[in-house]
Amino acid sequence: MAVSEIKPKLKLNPLTKVPISHNKRDRDLPGSLQCQLQHKEKKLSASQMAAFQDAYNFFYKDKTGCIDFHGLMCTVAKLGMNLTKHDVYNELKCADIDRDGKVNFSDFIKVLTDKNLFLKAVVPEKETCLDLAGNPGILLFEILSRLLETSALPRKSIIEIVSYFQRKFQHTGPGMLWSPYTMGYGKRTLKPDICTPPSSSMAAFANAARIAIMKEKDLFKFLEELKRCNSGSDSPYSKIPIFPLFPNVDGVVMGKPFKDMQKLEMLRIKEPLHFFEDYFFHKRDWKTQAANIKSMDPASGYSNNIFTIDQMLKKKQTCTVADATAIKQHVKRATDTYNLGIALEHRKEMLNLWQKIRGDLIGMDSRNESFYDTFSTYTWSWNVCQELLSPKDLRLYDAYVNRNSSHNSRSSSSSDTSECYTDSGRKRKRKGLKGFQQ
C-alpha cells in the first residue's frame, strides 16, 4: 500500500472538548466555587436599594450629587480614618466604574455588590488592617462598616445591609474560605489564625456568618482553638459579657393597647422568677450568695476571711507551697466577698436612679416596655459578670413601690378624714359654748 493512501486515513478529527489535564485552573478550583461563579447575582430589592441609598447619602458630594475626590476625603476624615491623598485617589479610581472621575449611585451599588471586592474586603490578602495598597477597592466596604458600627444609619437600613451581606457570604459556600486555593487558584494559601483579631471590620461580620454555616466537626475545632487561646484567668476582663447578638427588631413596635395591660399583668404574676435565659447563660444567683455572707468580725473590723489570712501569716514566718494554696483559697473568698458587697451597693444606687428618673412611667407613656431591657443592660457589673437588675427585678420593684404608695395614700386619706371630723366636732363645741355664754 502506498504512503499517499495511508495519510488520509490517519487524519485526526478536531477536538470538541478540552482535556482535563489541560484545564489546570478548573481542576484546582473547588467544585462549590465553580458553581458559584456561574451563579448570577440577584437584583437588589426595593428595601435594599433604600438602605444603600441611606449609606450613599452619608457621603459628602458635589453639586451634581456625586462623590468626588474632595467629598471622599471629607467623609474619610469625618469617620476618623487616616489615609493619604494618594490612597484616596486610587480608591476613587477603583470605584469609578463609568470612568467619569466621580462615583455616582450606580457606581456605588456596583462596587458594594461585586463578589470579588466583597471577598477581598472580608478575607484580605494582607494581614495589616486597612491595607489599601495591598487590597485596592475596599475603602467603600470599610466606610460602610464604620457606618454600621457607629449606628450612623437608620435602624431599618442597618438590618437590611447586614442581612444582605450575611446572605451573600453564606452563598459563597463554606469551602470558599476554608479551601487552600481560595481567591488565588493555587497561588495563595490561607492560614486562618483564630487567636488574631479580624484584619478588617467587614471580616468581623463575615466571621459571625461563617459560624452559622460551619459543619459540626469544624465547629468543635473552632471551640477547642478558642479555649486554647483563652486560658483561664481570674480577671473580670477575661470573661465574655452576655449581650444580644442581633438587635431587637421589635424594639420600635408599639406596645399592646391599654385594655390588654391587665391581662399582661396577670401573665407577669404567674411568670416564674427564674427565666430560661438564666439557665442557658448559667447566670448565678449572686444576691442569695451575697445574703449568705458572714458579717464582719466586730473585734477586728474585717471579714472572717481576711482575719484568717492575717492569722495564718502571723503564725508562720515562711510559707510552703501547701500554705500558699490555702492562703490563695482564702484570698479568693475574700475577693468574692468584696465584689459581692460592691455589687450590692451599686444595685441600691441603680434602684435609686430608676426611681429618680421614674423608669416605670417611661414605658407607660410610650406603651413600649423595652426600656426595662435597656436599663437592665445599663446595670451590667464586672463584679458579678452579669446585670445587677434584670427586667423582672425592675418590674417587681415597681409593683412594690406602687403598692406601698397606694397604701400610704389610703392611710393618709383616712387620717385626713378623721382629722376633718375632729375639727368639725371642735367647731360645734365652740359654737355651743358661745351660745351658752351669750
From Swiss-Prot:
Residues 405-438 are annotated as: Disordered. InterPro entries: EF-hand-dom_pair, EF_Hand_1_Ca_BS, EF_hand_dom. The modification Phosphotyrosine is found at residue 279. It comes from the Eukaryota. Residues 426-438 have a biased composition (Basic residues). It comes from Homo sapiens (Human). Residues 405-415 have a biased composition (Low complexity). Pfam families: EF-hand_8. Ca(2+) binds at residues 96, 98, 100, 102, 107. Coiled coil: none annotated. One of its GO terms (molecular function) is calcium ion binding. Keywords: Calcium, Metal-binding, Phosphoprotein, Repeat. This is EF-hand calcium-binding domain-containing protein 3. Residues 47-82, 83-118 form the EF-hand domain. PANTHER family: EF-HAND CALCIUM-BINDING DOMAIN-CONTAINING PROTEIN 13 (PTHR22656:SF1). PROSITE patterns: EF_HAND_1, EF_HAND_2.
